[in-house]
């Protein structure tokens, strides 16, 4: 199926993480123009040569916890390419195992700075550009933590629920100028962040042992992959999903089938 993304300008936030890299490669294969961000120039330099199918690629150093960085990156992309047709946000942070009775400001703060405020600043400044250009599409990598919670990581659960509310608000506001907002909610995702999850919940287990244990929570007995995420990003970025607005695309292997 031709997703008609070839001539689109795609901004991929946090493109050098596991999910971001898989997403960037998938959109490069569609022949898109790619603007990719990372907190590290060295990581951008390593990623860009891998995106051979893209029409054009340029990297931008950006820390999404800093609004000024996000604003500068968005302005630079528009200066370089004229517009932003699609914005894909792939950042994420889980943190440490910490129960509510042991909660610290620092742990909640870093979760909200990355997962919530980072998303807010991207929505704010990309949304402004999409209002100017009368349209666009935004897809955010969220989490099944946006609708279910695990004990022991309350900061993560709280901010992911907050992100879902923020995205639903953005979906309502942004359709006034023709921009769609949707988000993806994977369950256990086989990335470097999963190593932190294994450490948090299964101390003493190897990563492989932890993944095997976690996989049994899903009806298909496997974790979500970065390729699953990239394919969902392609779908939501394209007009194939044009009637989806403010929706969560769940990639959770049926984990929460009784709660949806």
Regions found by a protein language model. Name each.
Residues 175, 180, 244-246:
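Short, small/polar-rich loop/turn modules that mediate ligand/substrate recognition or access, typified
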Residues 16-18:
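Conserved glycine-rich cofactor-binding loop
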Residues 123, 159, 167:
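Active-site helix of classical SDR
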């Amino acid at each position: 199926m031709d997703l008609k993304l070839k001539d689109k300008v795609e901004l991929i936030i946090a493109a050098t993480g596991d999910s971001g890299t898989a997403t960037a490669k998938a959109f490069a294969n569609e022949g898109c123009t790619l603007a990719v961000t990372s907190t590290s120039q060295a990581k951008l330099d390593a990623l860009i040569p891998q995106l051979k199918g893209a029409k054009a690629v340029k990297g931008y150093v950006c820390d999404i916890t800093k609004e000024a960085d996000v604003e500068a990156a968005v302005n630079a992309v528009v200066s370089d390419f004229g517009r932003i047709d699609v914005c894909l946000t792939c950042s994420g942070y889980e943190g440490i195992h910490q129960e509510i009775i042991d909660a610290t400001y620092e742990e909640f703060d870093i979760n909200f700075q990355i997962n919530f405020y980072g998303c807010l600043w991207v929505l704010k400044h990309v949304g402004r550009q999409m209002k100017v250009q009368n349209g666009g599409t935004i897809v955010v990598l969220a989490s099944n933590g946006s609708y279910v919670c695990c004990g022991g990581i309350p900061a993560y659960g709280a901010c992911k629920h907050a992100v879902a509310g923020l995205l639903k608000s953005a979906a309502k506001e942004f359709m006034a100028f023709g921009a769609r907002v949707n988000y993806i909610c994977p369950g256990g995702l086989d990335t470097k962040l999963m190593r932190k999850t294994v450490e948090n919940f299964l101390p003493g287990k190897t990563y492989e042992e932890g993944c095997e244990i976690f996989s049994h929570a899903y009806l298909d007995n496997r974790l979500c992959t970065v390729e699953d995420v990239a394919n969902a990003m392609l779908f939501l970025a394209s007009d194939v999903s044009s009637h989806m607005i403010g929706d969560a695309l769940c990639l959770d292997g049926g984990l929460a089938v009784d709660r949806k």
